[in-house]
Amino acid sequence: MQQKCYYEILNVSKTASGVEIKRAYRKLAMEYHPDRNPGDKEAEIKFKEISEAYEILSDDSKRSRYDQFGHAGVNQQSGFGGTGGFEDIFDTFFGGGTSRGSNRSRASRGSDLEYTLEITLEEAFFGVEKEITIPRMESCDSCDGTGSKSRSKTTCHACHGQGTIRRQQGFFAFEQTCPVCNGTGYSITDPCDACYGNGKVKKQKTLKVKIPEGVDNGDRIRLQGEGDSGSNGAMNGDLYVQIIIKEHKIFERRDINLYCEMPISFTKACIGGDIKVPTLDGEVVLKVVPETQTGKVFRLREKGMKSLRGHRRGDLLCKVVVETPVNLSAEQKELLEKFADSLGEDYQSKHAPKSKTWFDNVKDYAKKFFE
């Protein structure tokens, strides 16, 4: 099956910047996250595709290999649990040395694991410690990880303990994993009842994860050695905790800045005054200047998100939305009519500059159209 283009998966061009790629990933990850689509297998598959694409394109080195060689340049290293690289490709076709192949097959590093953790914007701001439970492969206690009831192993008769066998095709000699022992170099005659000869069993592991303040959507936290157990004394894999930040009711995050819409009353917009604005670490008072219009943006410096790296802090940008009064009584309507009358016939020129400009443009356009 032909693999999908990573750029197409994220809906970005091949010249997209790192910021554009990250923004596209955040949007798609939120849309297809399994927690938002429970039981939807297609959404789960799509989320995995999005995560894989972002893993490659967010890494300059991997992205460069992908741009040069396509999926062949990154398949050995993309995803979790992948090992090896171009050296393994050459080893497959040209041997690479019996000793090196034997060591690699006998001692195998455990697979890396990924866990998606959803947190609130407040938790991303202040930092938090979360407890998670993951399924992972651990060494079988019943057989001490040997896979054998008697804890004994027999050297594989096919590869003589090497884990690989050498084959000749024309002028080429190459090594491949032994199909009899699957590269272990040994065979088991009395499989363990608990792990069925695998040497590993799946267990639930509970861990505490410290989330630093300032973490962002798509960031990954590495827990070294908390992945699947290695084989034959090899190192365990790592656990990568990928952060997803829930949508906030008030704020929208853009890098380290926060944005919000701030509704103000008709009278407050006209005459100005103080209003209380919520931030992630408490309320602040904002002075609204008289004659404020819808769309005006007030910047509250250093009231945004904390930076993950360094001591910078972003700003909070509040966009004004002037609310039109509703559910007016007869008396209130009468007062507004009197107010409108008090503005006089030259209302547009004196009191509504934007309206005057708009109507003037309409007149100019109509004049040209009908000439």
From Swiss-Prot:
Domain writeup: The J domain is necessary and sufficient to stimulate DnaK ATPase activity. Zinc center 1 plays an important role in the autonomous, DnaK-independent chaperone activity of DnaJ. Zinc center 2 is essential for interaction with DnaK and for DnaJ activity.
A Pfam family per the record: DnaJ
Family: Belongs to the DnaJ family.
PROSITE patterns named among the record's database cross-references: DNAJ_1, DNAJ_2, ZF_CR
Span of zinc fingers (CR-type): 127-204
Amino acids binding Zn(2+) 2: C156, C159, C178, C181
Limits of the J domain: 5-70
Protein name according to UniProt: Chaperone protein DnaJ
Main location: cytoplasm
Record has Membrane as a keyword: no
Example of a GO biological process term: protein refolding
Intervals holding CXXCXGXG motif repeats: 140-147, 156-163, 178-185, 192-199
Gene3D superfamilies: DnaJ domain, Heat shock protein DnaJ, cysteine-rich domain, Urease metallochaperone UreE, N-terminal domain
PANTHER family linked to this entry: CHAPERONE PROTEIN DNAJ (PTHR43096:SF48), DNAJ HOMOLOG 1, MITOCHONDRIAL-RELATED (PTHR43096)
